[in-house]
């Protein structure tokens, strides 16, 4: 029996029928959509199968982030398993040619006799590089999820990008999700079963790319997390070794976001993403331990760099703005995206963090849940040398002389998107309840709603309650939230208590989320009136 309050929340979110609600709460692999609904799928599979049959050399080319690393590893290992022996991979290098397919990588592929290039998590905007490959007689299949310019697409043989078809059922997919559908299509054609490692890597890439956790993404992440809960279920030696080195007993979405993902990302941020790919592909335990230890150490180094840069960025944030656009030529290029995310968390503004490279300004952008970042950057494209990404994240580069004008333009665009007021800071509850309503049924319903993320946010509740036993805890306060009959441990941000002069024993109207632990829960108070 589904908890009535959970059912009401889901109905407000568009799950109007019992069948919709049941499929949402109990996702299964059998609910996956037909992969051949993705335009270009049949042609892509035919081209790949023919290349394998003819023993033509295949290159998989991926991006350097978690999505690109998992996509590359996923497709490489799968194609090997179905008979591809003449296959290699290459990964973008953040510090040489940056995001996308570098011209040098294409020229090397041509020299190496590559006949088919398959891009993963990139390629939609790599017009010049793909043109070089095509002129040399190399076939190119682009698999990507980044926003395309429909009037200026690369001359690839096939482009598998769900965003080319706005009516597509797959527009929320990450790059690894597109690869997942490609593999699903090949499995269907060849009458073979999915292997568990396909789901594991697709889950990690999807979670870390911060895409909406609905529809296909919900199935991929929910089913993948069930497999990852016990490390003994992990069929990928390198991933299992990393989980062991991180001392994770029951892997959760939080572990993926804040431990596994950052380690995989650290390879591309500070060194070379191929270390992470090699880890996910190796069948040798000693090599797995060596690589997992290396990327874990890189992540520790990354954390120290981030701490200092975030503090510097916070100090530069201006009041009464709609955006954070911050520039420091000494900031490390590999951590800009993380710093941008921290700035969004700090004040809920779309944030762009910039540094200098080779005489140009380059950086990473992150959005809050209310702004389509890619659309905003399209409004500023005349000031940019290059940009690419999607609704929530993007990369940009521009000339120094255009920086101040870009700041002003981006600020104005975001202001207009917000309807000339700061609506992004308004908090809207999913449901008003009493603390008495927080019972086993509600908790079990919230567990079924997991994993939470964009498109499936942890519900915000509104209740009248008082607080007591206020104790300082890092950047927050630990408190007890209570009414006349129930008490719950809670966390409240210092900024909220300062702004509202919160006093023990007084009743307030509070907005909060219920944070689920392994054996208990607590409230995270996000606003008090």
Predicted regions and their residues:
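Active-site cavity-forming subdomains of large catalytic enzyme subunits
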Residues: 107-172, 180-188, 197, 214
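Metal-dependent catalytic neighborhoods of phosphoester/phosphodiester hydrolases
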Residues: 100-102, 128-134, 511
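Mid-to-C-terminal polyanion-binding domains and interfaces
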Residues: 54-56, 287-291, 297-327, 379-529
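Amphipathic alpha-helical transducer elements in NTP-driven molecular machines
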Residues: 127, 173-176, 180, 218-222, ...
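Acidic, metal-coordinating catalytic cores used for nucleic-acid/nucleotide bond scission
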Residues: 95-96, 122-125, 518
